């Protein structure tokens, strides 16, 4: 209220000056102003709020200014601040959105109205961590669908509007840089973005814009996963118990690069032509040290409950994995709008390409022989819910002796998933008056053609000849791997692991069945139309 009052006083003061200055000027025989025009500039956030208020249906509109007030690195994290939207995270960063409590697969995402598909072949949910928040001009979230929107969502649809050269008058250049420090792991995050735009010509009818964004995160992540299952007790009956404990220690480096461009010609509000495009690339380079406690490979001893159990002959494994994941999203759209009297027609042709690749997903696993006996078993105890579960392995520390673990296998996987989509859209609208009320009649057609391909190749070698020439101890660094209160030993040297991967990858036997069943191709053609009367 204080700031609004200050603005009000400033405006009143300006009007007062305008009102008295001609009189003073006249009395001093100076040139008199015939007309004074005061033009107000509406804040982008206020404009978005006005759009939201006047929207047909339940809609949220978020401006770039609002997004920029928070250090959100990607679109998913920017959307989490909208009422009714939650996000699913990966390594601490937002990746998928949930609109009004529905699954991520039930939401559709478009960029400037161009539908995009999920890069991940295993889900329909869109990886929104691929798109940085710096390229946003406006976010539009529709929680109820209208007939003129694609019927490819259930819970809601998100339209990511990129910046336009007509968002501001004249030449404008903007740049920003930022950074942060992560206390856990002592790493840093970096980001920077910039845009330049201008409008030219008679009455400023032609505009160009280019923007770019770059960010990089370096983080360490601890993770504990537990696999549960039904265990058959030797004395009869069964309990719901633990099959595996997975202790994961990640070192991740993520990079996002994005570019947007737009060329627009505007004669009037309903007479315009545009060409625009976006390109986003996300790279996740990850090393994972993992300790696996394989209860399922042991023998359950009598006395097990749903919270405690003892085993003999279990196995423990230590794994290093190097995985690189790359996501790319490209959209290009050419279109325009033209008025013919009261009839307004808009049309566009667009293409959207998405791609996910795993250039490397390399794993090296060492495993112990059977651990635990009937008289000295290994056990877990989950009865104290306020403390970390008690696992006797971390008391006996058998996993900390490198000579207890020997080579088990190497495994390699590469995959590429692509989808190419082309669309043609034509809409028309005509104002109508019914019973003294004004509205519009709107109708349109859309043709969409898409092709999706997935290709995966898997390899694995368990032969003794594939074992590293050096024992596990030679691969270990002096960097401890601790997951919460659990001592996992020392981390594997990533350079030595990569050297082993590069030397053995070509000789690892293919897993033909697993590779073939992961491959597929799907084609889709959709012709749709609608008509609506909006009052």
Where are these regions (language model features)?
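Flexible, surface-exposed loop regions and adjacent strand-edge segments
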Residues: 193, 224-233, 290-300, 362-372, ...
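Outer-membrane beta-barrel transmembrane strands
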Residues: 178, 188-197, 246-286, 315-364, ...
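Flexible glycine-rich, low-complexity coil/linker segments exposed to the extracellular/periplasmic environment
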Residues: 304-314, 374-409, 455-519
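N-terminal periplasmic "start-of-domain" segments of outer-membrane beta-barrel proteins
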Residues: 34-70, 96, 104, 114, ...
């Amino acid at each position: 209220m204080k700031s609004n009052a200050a603005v009000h006083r400033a405006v009143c003061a300006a009007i007062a000056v305008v009102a008295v200055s001609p009189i003073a000027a006249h009395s001093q025989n100076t040139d008199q102003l015939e007309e004074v025009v005061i033009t107000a500039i509406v804040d982008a956030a206020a404009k978005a709020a006005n759009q939201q208020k006047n929207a047909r249906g339940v809609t949220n509109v978020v401006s770039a200014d609002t997004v920029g007030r928070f250090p959100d690195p990607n679109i998913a994290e920017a959307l989490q601040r909208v009422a009714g939207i939650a996000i699913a995270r990966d390594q601490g960063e937002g990746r998928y959105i949930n609109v009004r409590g529905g699954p991520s697969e039930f939401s559709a995402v478009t960029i400037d109205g161009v539908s995009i598909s999920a890069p991940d072949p295993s889900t329909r949910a869109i990886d929104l961590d691929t798109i940085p928040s710096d390229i946003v001009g406006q976010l539009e979230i529709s929680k109820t669908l209208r007939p003129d929107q694609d019927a490819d969502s259930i819970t809601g649809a998100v339209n990511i509007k990129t910046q336009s050269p007509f968002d501001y008058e004249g030449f404008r250049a903007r740049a920003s840089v930022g950074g942060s420090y992560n206390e856990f792991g002592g790493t840093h995050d970096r980001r920077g973005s910039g845009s330049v735009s201008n409008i030219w010509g008679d009455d400023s009818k032609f505009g160009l814009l280019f923007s770019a964004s770059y960010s990089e995160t370096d983080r360490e992540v601890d993770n504990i996963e537990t696999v549960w299952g039904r265990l058959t007790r030797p004395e009869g009956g069964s309990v719901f118990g633990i099959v595996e404990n997975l202790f994961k220690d990640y070192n991740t480096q993520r990079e996002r690069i994005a570019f947007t461009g737009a060329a627009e010609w505007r004669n009037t509000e309903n007479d315009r032509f545009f060409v625009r495009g976006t390109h986003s690339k996300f790279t996740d380079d990850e090393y994972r040290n993992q300790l696996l406690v394989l209860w399922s490979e042991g023998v359950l001893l009598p006395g097990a409950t749903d919270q405690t159990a003892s085993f003999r002959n279990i196995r423990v494994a230590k794994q290093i994995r190097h995985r690189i994941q790359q996501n790319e999203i490209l959209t290009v759209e050419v279109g325009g709008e033209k008025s013919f009297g009261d009839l307004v027609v808009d049309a566009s042709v667009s293409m959207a390409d998405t791609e996910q690749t795993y250039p490397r997903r390399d794993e090296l696993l060492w495993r112990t022989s059977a651990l635990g006996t009937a008289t000295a078993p290994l056990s877990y105890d989950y009865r104290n819910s306020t403390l970390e579960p008690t696992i006797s392995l971390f008391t006996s520390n058998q996993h900390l002796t490198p000579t207890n673990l020997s080579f088990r296998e190497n495994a390699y996987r590469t995959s590429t998933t692509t989808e190419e989509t082309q669309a043609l859209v034509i809409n028309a609208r005509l104002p109508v008056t019914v019973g003294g009320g004004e509205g519009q009649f709107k109708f349109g057609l859309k043709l969409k053609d898409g092709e999706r391909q997935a290709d995966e190749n898997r390899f694995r070698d368990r032969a003794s000849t594939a074992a590293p020439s050096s024992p596990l101890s030679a691969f270990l660094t002096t960097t401890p791997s601790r997951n919460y209160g659990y001592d996992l030993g020392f981390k594997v040297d990533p350079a030595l692991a990569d050297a082993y991967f590069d030397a053995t990858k070509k000789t690892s036997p293919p897993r033909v069945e697993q590779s073939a069943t992961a491959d597929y191709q799907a084609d889709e053609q959709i012709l749709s139309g609608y008509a609506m009367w909006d009052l």
